[in-house]
Structures are given as C-alpha cells and as structure tokens.
From Swiss-Prot:
It comes from Methylobacterium sp. (strain 4-46). Gene3D superfamilies: Metal-dependent hydrolases, Urease, subunit C, domain 1. Its cofactor is Mn(2+). Its EC number is 3.5.4.2. Keywords: Hydrolase, Manganese. PANTHER family: ADENINE DEAMINASE (PTHR11113:SF2), N-ACETYLGLUCOSAMINE-6-PHOSPHATE DEACETYLASE (PTHR11113). Belongs to the metallo-dependent hydrolases superfamily. Adenine deaminase family. CDD domains: AdeC (cd01295). This is Adenine deaminase. InterPro entries: Adenine_deam, Adenine_deam_C, Amidohydro-rel, Metal-dep_hydrolase_composite, Metal_Hydrolase. The lineage of its organism: Bacteria, Pseudomonadati, Pseudomonadota, Alphaproteobacteria, Hyphomicrobiales. One of its GO terms (molecular function) is adenine deaminase activity.
Length: 564
C-alpha cells in the first residue's frame, strides 16, 4: 500500500510520468463553474494531477473536450432494466454512468437473501462501480403474497460487507412513524449507515419523524413544494426520471446552483429501449438543461451532490485524490458523451476485456397454475365500482368510482369509459388471485400480461377480453416470466424473462429489440400509454397511493386496507 501511495505522490508531483494523461481537456470545475484548460493525470484508478501539464506513459487526447466527473445514479433496480448486471454495465456505462447504487429489491422479493449474494458478487465483476443497498422492506406490505420475507436478523450478515452501502428505500414509512418494532429493529441495525427513503407525499410532523429516524434520501418526491420541504428538513431529494415515473419536469425549477448540493438524479426503473433511444443519466442532464437548469447545477447534482449524499467521498470531482471516473463531452448543453474513463480505464477497453460472469439465480420461479377465462369474472355490485385510475408518467394512481355495465350478475368492461379488467395472480407457490377494473390504458381488445409486478412480482394482466387474459397469463407461466401481448386467441408478441421472472439472459441489444414489437403490439390493442408494461408492473404496488391491486384484492393505500 505504501508503494502505491508513493507512486501517486511521485506522479502527482510530476517526478514520474503518470500512468495515464488526458491531455488538452477543458475541466468543468464543480466548485466555481469555471471551464479550465488542463491536463488530467491518473495513477492507477485515481486522479493525481489537474490544473497543469503532465507527462504520461499513456496519453488520451481530449482535443478540447469538456471533462466532467462520472455520473452517479443514486437509486435504481438493475432488474428493471430487464437484463443482468453485466449487460447493464455494457448498456449504461457508455452513457457516462460510472457509479450505480443498486437496490436488488425486486430479486429479493422473489429469492430472499440469495438476491443479496448474487448482487454483491456480480457487482465485483462489472467495470461500472456498483454499490449495493440492502432491501429494507421484503415484502413491502402484508397486503400481498411475496416469495420471501427478510427481517433484521437476515440483514445482519450483509451489513458490513464492503460492497454494501447501507439500507435501501424504506418503503414502510407508516410503520416507521408508528414505531413498528420490526422497522425500528432494522433502523437500529443500520444506525450511522446510509438509509434511503421512500416517502411519497409525506409532510409535516410525520416527515419530521421519518427523517429523525435516520432517513437521508428520497426518490418518491413528485412536486416542488414537497421537494422543498424535504430538503429544508435535511434530506437529499433524488430527482427521478425513469421509464414510467417521470418527475424531472416538475422538479427542475427547484434545481438551482444554490439548491444543487441537496438534489441528485436517479432513474429507479429504466428499460434498454428507453436507454437506447433517449439515454440514461445523460438524458436527465440533457433534459434538465433544456428545461432551464444551469449546467453547473445539473452536473453537480449528477456527481458531486450524489457522492456527498451517499458518503462516497472518493468521487464526484475531477481532483487529486478522487477516483478517476471521467466523462469527456463534445457538448455541455446536450451532454453529448464522447468518451468515458471508469476507475482509470477507458470504458470501451474495459468492457471488451474477458470477465467472470456469475450465473444469475432464480430460474423456475413462476409457480402458478394455469387459469381459465372464467377466473376473471368480477361480481357486479350495486352502485359505483372502485376503479384504478392510471396517470400517464406517474406510478401514483387515482381511486375512481364508475358505474359499470353488468350481465348475469357479472360486471363488464366498458370501453366507452376506458375501463377494462385487471387481475393479479400469485406465483410464488401459494394460491391467490384478485380481479378488478382499471381506467387509462386505452385498450379496445386483447390483453397485456407481465411477471414484473412491483413489489412482490406476482403475475399481472390487463385486458378487454377474458379469453385473451387467460392466454396471456398461461403463456407467462410457460415462459417462466416475461411480457406477453395476446389478441384474438393468439400471442402477438412476447419477451421471456426466465431469471426470477424479472430478467432476460440475452444481451441487452436483443432485449432492446424485443421491446419494439411488444410496444407495437400493445398499441395495436389501442393502448395509449408510452410504456405499457412498466405501467402494468406498478399496478400491484401497495405502497404508492391511492388505489392498487394485489393477489388479495383492491388496496386502498391511503388507509392500508383491502377493500371489501
């Protein structure tokens, strides 16, 4: 170790050539906002010199490109990219994301602590620096059937793992505020460590209590007033822009040079097609600047503020002593990424090098019996029916009341009101199924089914035809998970996700290409949502207001109860 320190000192002082020099860069100083012409000297995986000229064993000519610190995605689920961590690395690192904070919550709900074992090992095999936060709420609630239950003692063996960054999104904010013993046990176990939050619309004294419990960050903030209250109370708000949850437009006015130390970026859930077409964190930076955010504020939020929020003091700036995570840009305003250096290595070379790939667990995880069309019958009730109201671009849903047609004692879909059926079928070995209605998909025919169903990942199907709903679900079971579009008694498009019913074992390019016909098939049913499959996937999430559905029934999230 002392030899390595001596090497860094010698190279930083210019007495020895640096391992790598990025020559003729324009460094965006995140302290002052200045653009400074300089070389950047790198020794091993660390920066040893800036603000001057250096000689190097290897030289990369920046040719006047702007150098910014590598981007940090502060909260994501790799599983939601539908690909393995190794493919996620190939897909996302070229977009400038050199650090990702992964909550393997989706895998954990299916596999239990085996998800942590896999995530921590896979993170050692990626070029991108992936840090794992341990899932805090498995299951999210007791209002659904999950594949696993993880209490405080099960978390203890992983707490001090060098790849573990702390406790991931604490979804059970009502439990924390009420002093639930199970919640308190987890918080006590991680006292002094980073604990990530999940507190949509929480405010006032309840928010005070939540923050006082040690919660430091939150990514479920959807409005500027909510965000301002949270940062004033000491939280860092992680501005989210994923494939479904899109909060950046609403929160961008709050992101200024003054507030940027208290705001960062995250994607949460973003699929390979959106990454290919729009980008990753580079897309968020581009969008923020396009909405009027000062470039200094945007790039600071994407790196330095994120590093500070999560205690990653070794990164977030291009400065001596920091990790050599560097992004070269052709253009600052559009965040046009030209080249990425990750831990001192050019990303394109590191990604091409042979690497170990730990096999992913979770095959054979869909343990559900086939269903018949009659299973989707919903008994008619007098008066109005509770219907889930989908809000495009949001995972918050509305609790709507509609009068639906009926025949022979059964409630029917009403296409004139855009009301179709939705069902959740348990898939972890125990029986369970619930049916209801949803408004906002625009379906005129057929069905869309998914084995991705946050957070317990039971099977979820939305459809205007019971026979097609049964066909789509049964095809999911045969595939051992995935996405299916069915119409007129035939499967129109599908993508198998055999790893825990959540991830593909294919290269990201193949998954990206498979999403095109799936979206087209969904549009062919009349679907008006830009990302129908992830929208389906959030219908069973009973921690996000206001009305959801699980395998046990419709859930009034505001009262945390199953509707009769």
């Amino acid at each position: 170790m002392s030899d390595e320190i001596a090497r860094r000192i010698a190279q930083g002082a210019g007495r020895a050539p640096a391992d790598l020099v990025i020559r003729d860069a324009r460094l965006l100083d995140l302290v002052t906002g200045d653009l400074v012409d300089t070389d950047i000297a790198v020794c091993g995986d660390g920066i040893v010199g800036t603000y001057g000229e250096y000689a190097g064993t290897r030289v990369i000519e920046a040719e006047g490109r702007v150098a910014v610190p590598g981007f940090i995605d502060t909260h994501l689920h790799v599983e939601s990219s539908l690909i393995t961590p190794h493919e996620f690395d190939r897909c996302v690192l070229p977009h400038g994301v050199t650090t990702a904070i992964w909550d393997p919550h989706e895998l954990a709900n299916v596999l239990g602590t085996a998800a942590f074992d896999y995530a921590l090992q896979a993170a050692r095999e990626t070029v991108m620096d992936i840090r794992v936060q341990l899932s805090s709420c498995v299951p999210a609630t007791d209002l659904e059937s999950s594949g696993a239950r993880i209490e405080a003692e099960a978390l203890r063996p992983y707490r001090d793992h060098p790849g573990s960054l702390g406790l991931a999104e604490f979804m059970n904010f009502p439990g924390i505020v009420a002093g639930d013993p199970a919640c308190l046990a987890k918080l006590a176990l991680f006292a002094g460590r980073h604990v990530d939050g999940h507190a949509p619309l929480l405010s006032g004294r309840d928010l005070n209590a939540y923050v006082a419990a040690g919660i430091r960050t939150d990514h479920e903030t959807t409005g500027p007033a909510e965000a301002l209250e949270k940062i004033r109370k000491g939280m860092t708000v992680l501005i989210r822009e994923g494939s479904v949850s899109k909060d950046l437009r609403a929160l961008a006015p709050l992101l200024t040079v003054a507030t940027s130390p208290f705001l960062a970026f995250c994607t949460d859930d973003r699929n390979p097609l959106d990454i290919a077409e729009e980008g990753h964190l580079d897309a968020l930076i581009r969008m923020a600047i396009g909405l009027g955010v000062a470039p200094l504020a945007a790039y600071r939020a994407a790196s330095l503020s994120a590093a500070t929020a999560f205690g990653l003091a070794d990164r977030g700036m291009i400065a001596p002593g920091r990790r050599a995570d560097i992004v070269l840009l052709d253009d600052v305003e559009t965040c046009a990424v030209a080249r990425v250096i990750a831990g001192g290595r050019p990303a394109e070379e590191a990604l091409a090098a042979p690497r170990t790939r730990t096999p992913a667990p979770g095959r054979g995880s869909v343990k559900a019996a086939p269903v018949a069309p009659e299973a989707f019958r919903v008994a008619a009730a007098p008066g109005e029916t509770s219907v889930i109201g989908v809000v495009p671009g949001r995972i918050i849903t509305e609790h709507r009341r509609l009068t639906l047609p009926a025949r022979d004692g059964a409630a029917l879909c009403d296409l004139a009101q855009d009301a179709v059926k939705v069902a959740v079928i348990a898939r972890h070995g125990a029986p369970g199924m619930a049916c209801g209605f949803v408004q906002g998909f625009g379906l005129r025919r057929g069905a869309i089914a998914s084995s991705v169903g946050h957070d317990s990942h039971n099977l979820c199907v939305v459809g205007a035809d019971e026979a097609d709903m049964a066909l789509a679900v049964n095809r999911l079971i045969a595939l051992q998970g995935g996405f299916v579009v069915a119409e007129g008694g035939a499967v129109r498009a599908e993508l198998a996700l055999p790893i825990a019913g959540l991830m593909s074992d294919l290269p990201f390019e193949a998954v990206r290409d498979a999403l095109h016909p799936l979206r087209e098939a969904a549009r062919g049913l009349g679907c008006t949502l830009p990302e129908p499959f992830l929208q389906v996937a959030f219908l069973p999430l009973p921690m996000i207001p206001h009305l959801k559905i699980t395998d046990r029934g419709l859930v009034d999230v505001d009262r945390m109860r199953i509707l009769p």
